[in-house]
């Protein structure tokens, strides 16, 4: 099963909080974000640190400090958020190259296929912006279907 971690889900909430209009300077404290997102302040602080390390958030220390998006929400992709929190997007260990090669790698005829599938998923996630995640009905209208029928695949016509 493909599933994002709860921390990635929380990161999108935090980024959504940062995308909301804010006062002069646009800086938000971790405490404000924690209240807004209903997440614990330590969790928010940890996420802000990871998102800042990935260049998605700018942070400033001190009494007047806080954080803000490093770029507009429409210029931050879902793929970037996932990679900031979870690391490279990879369906199998052989795709991300982080682990030692498996014992079947020499004769594996699937690795090229997994690379193609992985790239397609990465590309799809790269086309979805944070702005789209924050306003899904504008960008992803509800899919209407008859009761008992499976939902159509986005981008495919249903006959």
Task: Locate predicted features.
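Short alpha-helical segments that sit at the start of domains
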Residues: 1-15
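A short alpha-helical element within helix-turn-helix/winged-helix DNA-binding domains
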Residues: 27-37
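Alpha-helical residues within the helix-turn-helix
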Residues: 35, 52-53
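Key DNA-contact positions within bacterial/archaeal DNA-binding proteins
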Residues: 42
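Short, hydrophobic-biased segments on the C-terminal half of alpha helices
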Residues: 48-49
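Beta-hairpin "wing" of winged helix-turn-helix
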Residues: 55-70
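Conserved segment of winged-helix/HTH DNA-binding domains
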Residues: 73-97, 110-119
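C-terminal regulatory/oligomerization modules of transcriptional regulators
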Residues: 96-159
